[in-house]
């Protein structure tokens, strides 16, 4: 009997030990995880050069071609004249900065079915600053106070014998006509049909909406620098080809930009006068804005002969046009506003503040 008991103990003892070990709570705890370093690069797992611009406030100071003028509390006017470091050419640039955090001001989008000129908008609205707005109505989506005034009606942009596929609505400006202004790359990589569908949906909830192109800066990414690379030239002799329009020809430019600290920039660059202001491409304008103002968002608007800015107390003493519209540089220039005809005389003693073009849309700042 003793031998049998000893035998059973020898057989069962290892089993008891095994069971006891398995019942130990500490043995079921998994090993600690291997530490993982968080990736700061966002969804793509990458960082970008433009991320270094976040949190930086950049503004020009007086000197080096810049003149800085305080217009009112929260509104500053900048004028540059000289050789720009980006384009390596002579330029005249005009910028009005409005602090949207200041509740004393409203920023508004105006639409005139019979068109208007910036100086008349300035006087009729008692504005502090006015700037021309969007492209021709057939090329943009425009919603005013919830009513659609333009719906990208044209599939093509006609210029002489050329019909260029529509390209002027890749991005948009959304406003409440007070202090909420947003610049978004809404139509990025979309077809024309998708633009129409997307903006029609947006117009149901957005009170004021206007499209334009190209987007210049999208959350600090300088997308305007590569616009022409993404749009290879198709019609090299047509000024409405997007590559020609934005890249291979330098023109007067108008842009709207917004900084990370919620300041809005009206931007106009003169052009078509090589010895005074050559004009600028979309890529050059993008770099110029990054270097001098570091906006978080920026969008190109209608430029060329349309580019015009008025600022209170600046420029022409009667009209307050600060830049030098180029339409009357070579000959008299005639415009029509409704049933009225205006003839701007040809420049006789160098650039003047006349030659405004009549256009349908404007941005302006007013004091409440």
List the predicted regions and their residue ranges:
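Active-site-adjacent helix-turn-beta-strand microarchitecture at beta-sheet edges
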Residues: 139-245
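Zymogen propeptides
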Residues: 22-186
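Bacterial N-terminal signal peptides that target proteins for export
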Residues: 1-8
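Alpha/propeptide regions of enzymes that mature by internal proteolysis
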Residues: 126-128, 132, 296-299, 307
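C-terminal motif of bacterial Sec signal peptides marking the signal peptidase cleavage site
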Residues: 15-18
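Conserved, well-ordered active-site substructure
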Residues: 140-165, 232-293, 297, 306-368
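Short acidic-glycine loop/turn motifs at beta-strand connectors
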Residues: 99-101, 174-180, 218-220, 258-263, ...
């Amino acid at each position: 009997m003793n031998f049998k008991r000893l035998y059973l103990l020898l057989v069962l003892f290892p089993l008891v030990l095994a069971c006891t070990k398995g019942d130990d709570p500490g043995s079921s705890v998994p090993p600690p995880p291997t530490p993982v370093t968080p990736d700061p690069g966002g969804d793509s797992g990458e960082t970008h050069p433009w991320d270094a611009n976040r949190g930086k406030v950049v503004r020009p100071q007086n000197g080096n071609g810049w003149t800085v003028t305080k217009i009112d509390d929260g509104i500053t006017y900048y004028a540059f004249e000289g050789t720009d470091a980006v384009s390596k050419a002579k330029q005249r640039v005009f910028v009005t900065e409005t602090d949207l955090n200041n509740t004393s001001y409203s920023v508004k989008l105006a639409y005139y079915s019979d068109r208007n000129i910036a100086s008349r908008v300035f006087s009729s609205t008692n504005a502090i600053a006015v700037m021309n707005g969007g492209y021709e109505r057939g090329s943009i989506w425009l919603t005013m106070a919830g009513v659609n005034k333009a719906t990208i009606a044209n599939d093509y942009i006609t210029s002489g014998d050329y019909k260029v596929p529509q390209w002027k609505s890749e991005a948009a400006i959304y406003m409440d006509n007070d202090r909420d202004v947003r610049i978004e790359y809404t139509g990025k990589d979309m077809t024309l049909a998708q633009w129409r569908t997307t903006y029609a949906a947006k117009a149901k909830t957005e009170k004021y909406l206007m499209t334009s192109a190209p987007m210049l800066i999208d959350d600090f990414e300088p997308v305007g620098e590569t616009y022409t690379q993404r749009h290879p030239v198709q019609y090299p002799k047509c000024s409405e080809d997007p590559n020609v329009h934005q890249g291979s020809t330098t023109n007067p430019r108008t842009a709207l930009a917004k900084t990370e600290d919620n300041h809005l920039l009206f931007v106009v660059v003169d052009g078509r006068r090589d010895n005074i202001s050559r004009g600028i491409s979309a890529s050059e304008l993008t770099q110029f804005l990054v270097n001098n103002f570091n906006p978080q968002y920026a969008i190109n608007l209608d430029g060329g002969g349309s580019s015009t800015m008025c600022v209170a107390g600046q420029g022409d003493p009667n009209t307050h046009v600060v830049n030098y519209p180029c339409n009357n540089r070579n000959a008299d220039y005639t415009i029509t506003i409704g049933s009225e005809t205006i003839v701007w005389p040809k420049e006789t003693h160098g650039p003047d503040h006349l030659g405004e073009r009549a256009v349908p849309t404007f941005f302006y700042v007013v004091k409440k």
